[in-house]
Design a protein with these regions (language model features):
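Catalytic-pocket segment enriched in acidic/His residues
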Residues: 1-112
Length: 112
């Protein structure tokens, strides 16, 4: 992976998180978590972290060669198959996007 992904995930308002963060110790296997993204309750993406191109460990090793990581830092890994850009599905005002990660929870974001 390249630092270009890091740059594209780091601009203002582009990385909603919460309402909580789960400590790494509470995640039994980060390489085996089910993921789902819906827009207005229609499934757009569904997958598992086991299918990631690079493992969490590989991402951290590569990233720390470029920048130091400190406690509390968040590493954005990307999404599973089904990215809307390639299907020309774009969010519009009034849409609600829901992201779910097994064992962590779900995040609901309205589009304004």
């Amino acid at each position: 992976f390249g630092m270009d992904w890091f740059r594209h995930k780091s601009f203002d308002t582009s990385a909603p998180m919460g309402p909580w963060i789960v400590p790494a110790a509470d995640i039994i296997d980060p390489q085996n978590l089910n993921l789902k993204t819906t827009i207005n309750d229609e499934v757009m993406q569904e997958g598992n972290t086991s299918t990631m191109v690079f493992s969490i460990a590989e991402l951290i090793v590569s990233l720390t060669r470029q920048v130091p990581l400190k406690p509390g830092d968040v590493v954005a890994t990307g999404t599973c198959a089904g990215v809307g850009f390639f299907r020309e599905i774009f969010l519009k005002p009034g849409d609600t996007m829901r992201l779910e990660i097994e064992g962590i929870g779900e995040l609901n974001n309205p589009t304004i």
